[in-house]
């Protein structure tokens, strides 16, 4: 039989390298002390399961594992799909068996990895159903590490923080992973704000985050993040390394830190010890929390991906996943069963599944200039960051307005970029509204044109999923990007146009390779904001309407 496990009961004498102490067709896979040789390098013949068809089972056979793989890494393969109830490592064979809590979870796992090849330590691995319906392990020394790892992981996954924080669980996790619970995080292509609260929102889906320190080094935004245990750190690294927080930017590069613990002295927008809420802020500057925490750490943000919080690679095909239900991971919010088109559209905005914006899409905008603000001006300004659906200026409090975006992620972008900027001479304040939608006035209700529905507006910038406009979203700046300029319009024409409403034009430059585009620099950010509101979609003739957006460049 050359060491292949047969599908019939056998009663022949077994050698020391035989894997099973009991072998029954489709019965439990029983690991005993006689299997010790299979964990070493002297066992040559074991080839795992002999199968011709992938009959679903709770037990999954993993092959071609890297020789230095850890128990934690193998367990992490199954975590996004449900609870891992047992593990058998055959390191000498570069194989493992994972037992899931349900056949459904195992089936989802195998289906997923059939379409997206799993990789551990840069090496492709292979996953298939086992012939065996369950794993039964004994108390042999070879199983001690696997069981300790399982206990540590499951204690965190089930929310049993007391057990997870116990010395035994932490020690077992350290021995299992051989790694620090501290991660070093570098964010590349930082086009949008990434704050301490953004990181906490993302990384807390994989375990209990104890401390975070953020800093800038070599002109790169970096962070150190400490988990309660190395298992969570391992899981987060495997799931998030190389992923983009937002589409096509803010790429996470994650490594283990040489530090085993962080020393946080202050709780502010740069550092946080979640176990010590009593720590001082350490400076007199207002914390970014006031403007950012509501945006990115808001409760109720849900995933537009059916694999909520699972941290799948960006290669995962969203349409294939629509409607699937996968058990939550580390308290991740409930997955949504949504149409594939909606899933694909949402995925084009936010790259990490657990951060996609199906949360509150309505913003409360206050401290407006009641003499000058109009629904149209708010539509154009907020439309730089998403597709505005409705705007309502409050009838009895015209310094306040509600702006409804297409989804929660767009609302968060608009809030993070516009909060505190001046509009019509006043610094606007923006928060998430308690309302879930903006109501249109009833027929006959006095409104004075203060409520507008823009749901079908042709001026939406982000109608097409994956549009390049998603990659050109920048905070308000004095420099504006102009496009769709006809050949007959000159530099002087545009300078005259932008100074006609009292603004000062400080600089202008056509793009060398494309005179349909240009940069124009106004006297201040406030002037640029006003110019964008007044001149976006301005008719330049020849069937050309000017497109205006904020630029990250200067002249």
Swiss-Prot record:
InterPro entries reported for this sequence: HnRNP-L/PTB, Nucleotide-bd_a/b_plait_sf, PTBP1-like_RRM2, PTBP1_RRM1, PTBP1_RRM3, RBD_domain_sf, RRM_dom
Modification sites for Phosphoserine: 16, 140, 457
Keyword Ubl conjugation assigned: yes
CDD domains: RRM1_PTBP1, RRM2_PTBP1_like, RRM3_PTBP1
Subcellular location: Nucleus
Protein name listed in UniProt: Polypyrimidine tract-binding protein 1
Biological processes, Gene Ontology terms: gene expression; IRES-dependent viral translational initiation; mRNA processing; negative regulation of mRNA splicing, via spliceosome; negative regulation of muscle cell differentiation; negative regulation of neuron differentiation; neurogenesis; positive regulation of calcineurin-NFAT signaling cascade
Assembly: Monomer. Part of a ternary complex containing KHSRP, PTBP1, PTBP2 and HNRPH1. Interacts with SFPQ. Interacts with RAVER1. Interacts with IVNS1ABP (via BACK domain); the interaction is direct.
Molecular function GO labels: pre-mRNA binding; RNA binding
Function: Plays a role in pre-mRNA splicing and in the regulation of alternative splicing events. Activates exon skipping of its own pre-mRNA during muscle cell differentiation. Binds to the polypyrimidine tract of introns. May promote RNA looping when bound to two separate polypyrimidine tracts in the same pre-mRNA. May promote the binding of U2 snRNP to pre-mRNA. Cooperates with RAVER1 to modulate switching between mutually exclusive exons during maturation of the TPM1 pre-mRNA. Represses the splicing of MAPT/Tau exon 10.
Entry keyword set: Acetylation, Activator, Isopeptide bond, mRNA processing, mRNA splicing, Nucleus, Phosphoprotein, Repeat, Repressor, RNA-binding, Ubl conjugation
